[in-house]
Design a protein with these regions (language model features):
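Conserved Class I S-adenosyl-L-methionine
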Residues: 3-11, 22-23, 49-51, 171-263
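Conserved alpha-helix/loop element of class I SAM-dependent methyltransferases that forms part
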Residues: 21-40, 55
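Class I SAM-dependent methyltransferase SAM/SAH-binding core
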Residues: 41-99
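A short hydrophobic/small-residue beta-strand
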Residues: 66, 136-137, 193
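A short acidic, Gly/Pro-enriched loop at the edge of an enzyme's catalytic core
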Residues: 97-107
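A short SAM/SAH-binding and catalytic strip from SAM-dependent methyltransferases
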Residues: 105-120, 142
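A short glycine-rich, Lys/Arg-flanked "PGG" loop and its adjoining helix->strand segment in the class I
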Residues: 120-135
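Conserved class I S-adenosyl-L-methionine
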Residues: 137-163
């Protein structure tokens, strides 16, 4: 997963641009649905700059604690800077597949499980870090989220001389992109009392945010190998194509799934 950490580190500035309009609202919604209470212990996996870890720390208060882990050190630095008033929140550079502290009231992962090397095995292991009767909370993209932005980016790359690529699809995220799929997947991990909430959200796509979602997310990998001199042309073409196709908002509908571990 270290390569992915490097991708998000490289997009730190753009990731910050997206915080108020994308990551933070979804992170706050996740914490609200998780029902965090004062004094609880929380593990936030793939925490980024803390969009869900920071509201979690506020929810558990000074008697609780949040461990927030990620592979992107520059995003962790950003999170620490944003959480100076929250001593109950610790940001740690760590691999989620190796974290072994147990006994959490809540283990939450926002937009992260589909990046794990083996989504099923790694997620089952993470759920096992919660105490008996604890909650495992997963937030993922809804079925129609993000698209057609990746395709338009691909068209812009090709139009400026980049190599065409087959559509990447949604990868493991395809298996958890509807309420029924996410509910079934969480149940398959052995969780009980599973429920899924749909959080409706969208993000405006202007000249700044449209490029930020490319450079501050995994879409950045589509630009790998392109010469730096080509990037301004790809950006200009991308913005033009969005305008030509009348795409001025990105669907960011998200699914929040919550299940309990066996007592």
């Amino acid at each position: 997963m270290s390569d992915l950490g490097d991708v998000f580190d490289a997009g730190r500035d753009e990731f910050a641009v997206l915080g108020p309009v994308l990551w933070n609202p979804i992170g706050e919604a996740t914490v609200a649905e998780a029902g965090l209470r004062p004094g609880e212990r929380v593990l936030d996996v793939c925490c980024g700059a803390g969009s869900s870890a920071i509201p979690a720390a506020r929810a558990v208060g000074s008697d609780g604690h949040v461990d927030a882990i990620d592979l992107a050190e520059r995003l962790l630095e950003q999170g620490r800077a944003n959480a100076r008033d929250l001593p109950q929140l610790t940001f740690t550079h760590a691999d989620a597949t190796r974290w072994d502290t147990t006994g959490y009231d809540v283990v939450q992962c926002v937009f992260g499980v589909f990046f794990l090397p083996d989504m099923d095995a790694a997620s089952a292991r993470l759920a096992g870090l919660a105490k008996p009767g604890g909650r495992f909370v997963v937030t993922t993209w809804g079925e129609h989220a993000i698209w057609p932005v990746p395709e338009i980016l691909g068209d812009a790359v090709v139009a400026e001389g980049g190599a065409p690529q087959a559509s990447p699809g949604r990868g493991p995220g395809e298996r958890i992109c509807t309420p029924d799929k996410l509910r079934g997947w969480l149940t398959g991990l052995g969780l009980e009392d599973v429920r899924v909430v749909t959080f409706e959200h969208s993000m405006p796509l202007d000249d700044t945010t449209s490029w930020a979602i490319v450079m501050g997310s995994a879409m950045r990998m589509r630009l790998k190998g392109l010469p730096e001199s080509l990037l301004p042309k790809v950006r200009a073409r991308f913005v033009d194509l969005l305008r030509d196709r009348k795409v001025d908002r990105m669907n960011a509908v998200s699914l929040i799934g919550i299940g309990r571990t066996a007592e």
